[in-house]
Design a protein with these regions (language model features):
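Short active-site oxyanion
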Residues: 38-42, 61, 158-160, 220-221, ...
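Conserved acidic, metal-coordinating active-site core of Asp-based
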Residues: 106-225
Length: 278
């Protein structure tokens, strides 16, 4: 069995259920055991730094690649820091807004959401005769400590999460922002089309390589765990890739192995199966 020296973990749908910040007890125990065995454990996530920090209360990590590789931290040291340029930032935020796409701007200090999104969900709830959508969004915003866009102070943006009422609206915005790629999420939450900007200067795979270079580990001696399309660059960069059982089909087909779901304690079981525990 290969002796993997570095472990990379996606958060949403891998370490935790999507939109949550409390990992299963079994996953925390597995991380602690792997670190006792001398392995380095890193988060590799689309979340900005502020949104991943709640995870740091549950387990010790050796660092993280936040914002899909836009910010890489090893220990207390910034290894890579590459937000959007002011021009890119202004362009993408304006294009999305002009096309009626709701935005969550992710910065190092926090995530800022369009206030109009709640009004949109409230109207959908009235139409559907329930309060499910608004309760769902309010719970996510509270768990992830999101803030309203009116509080955004202009700090550098690393990525923008998009939630569009229709695919047509999102397609128009994407066509106007040719300087970016967009990763479409393969989970349609409440019939909304979800996507995230992808900066062509980096991705999760670059995050893996940056971390490995900083700690002197060959990427071939790393293993990663993910569940969705934005994890594919990470799958390609690490020596071995594992997709969660709850992951999308494209991610499962791209991974070297598939483990049980988050809900079934898949991460801890996979750590044991691949000899990562002390």
């Amino acid at each position: 069995m290969h002796d993997y020296r570095a472990i990379f973990l996606d958060i949403d749908g891998t370490l935790t259920q999507p939109g949550h910040s409390a990992p299963p007890v079994s996953a925390v125990a597995a991380i602690e055991s792997a670190r006792r065995a001398g392995r380095r454990v890193f988060l590799c996530t689309g979340r900005c730094e502020a949104m991943l920090k709640p995870l740091l209360h549950y387990a010790d990590f050796d660092g993280y690649a936040a914002s899909s590789g836009g910010l890489v931290v090893v220990g207390s040291r910034d290894v890579f820091d590459c937000p959007m340029t002011p021009q890119e930032q202004a362009h993408v935020l304006t294009a999305l807004s002009d096309n009626g796409v709701f935005r969550t701007a992710q910065t190092r200090m926090g995530a800022y959401c369009d206030e109009g999104f709640r009004d949109f969900l409230r109207a959908r709830d009235v139409q559907n005769g329930s309060s499910e959508l608004l309760r769902w969004r309010e719970a996510i915003e509270q768990r992830l400590q999101m803030q309203p866009m009116r509080d955004y102070g202009g700090e550098p943006v690393y990525s923008v999460v998009c939630m569009s009422p229709t695919r047509e609206q999102l397609d128009k915005a994407m066509a106007e922002c040719s300087e970016f790629d967009f990763v479409l999420m393969d989970d349609r939450q409440h019939d909304l089309v979800n996507a995230e900007t992808a900066n062509r200067r980096y991705d999760k795979g670059c995050g893996v390589k940056q971390v490995c270079a900083a700690i002197g580990v060959d990427p071939a001696d790393s293993i990663c765990f993910g569940d969705s399309l934005n994890d594919l660059p990470m799958f390609g960069a690490a020596g071995f890739s594992v997709c969660m059982g709850n992951g999308g089909e494209a991610a499962k087909q791209s991974a070297d192995a598939v483990c049980d779901s988050v809900e079934a304690g898949g991460l801890a079981k996979a750590f044991a199966d691949f000899g990562l525990l002390a």
